[in-house]
């Protein structure tokens, strides 16, 4: 049985996932790793808006980053999050 702390942390995770922009970013990162400029271009958003959302996702340990020269590339922290999103999309798509 989960502890109170685990239940609280799970609720916090779902709060972070409760934003359509962050879900769109996560969905994109399920394909590959991307830098902020590429994410912004693909989602038709500003780089500052994407950076803000990525900070929240990184703080929640949903994405990680790596620096290559002056660019920072973002990817999934681990595969658990893509499994959660995939399961949610399947659930929504059910008749």
List each model region and its residues.
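N-terminal helix-turn-helix DNA-binding core of bacterial DNA-binding proteins
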Residues: 8-48, 72-79
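Beta-hairpin "wing" of winged helix-turn-helix
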Residues: 58-68, 75
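Recognition helix of helix-turn-helix DNA-binding domains
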Residues: 48-49, 54-55, 67
